[in-house]
Amino acid sequence: MVEVLVLYYSRTGRTEALANAIVEGIESVEGASAKLKRVDYATVNDFISCDAVAFGSPNYFSYMAGVMKDFFDKALSIRERVAGKPSVAFTSGGGSSNSALLSLERMISSFRLEKAADGVVSQREPSEENLRACKKLGETLAKRALERSEVPKD
């Protein structure tokens, strides 16, 4: 069984709705379980112990939420321990910009995580299309975590 961590921040519930759709996708994959956690309650041990991770944030001033950036700052010391884990990003916001998503994807790259799929950007209230895309994102991430867990380690 692989565990996929879904770390998110949501003030209005929009990003949380996307996170719940990702959880639904993860749990639709046999052999995968999801752990949904607000980033302000997450620890670096949550990051270390998972097999894959999804990061979700609102778009604040064309960037991820400060509490998400704070989590990455705290996790810097364990970067080598999480390198290679499959990951994805998703964002919500009032604008049409994908800059918050790009900021999360830069962190994914900086931590040498594996980008398992392109992220999802939702504008305003998540649409059914956004929720379907997030469910698919969760499925893809869970399948990649399972594939990676089956690769023999040297």
Regions found by a protein language model. Give the residues of each.
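Residues at alpha-helix caps and immediate loop-helix transition turns in enzyme cores, especially N-
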Residues: 18, 67, 100, 130-133
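Short helix-loop-beta junction
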Residues: 20-32, 109-112
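Generic structural signal for residues in well-ordered beta-strands
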Residues: 34-36
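Helix-loop-strand module that forms the ligand-binding subsite of alpha/beta enzymes
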Residues: 39-117
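Glycine-rich phosphate/pyrophosphate-binding loop and the adjoining helix
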Residues: 43, 115-154
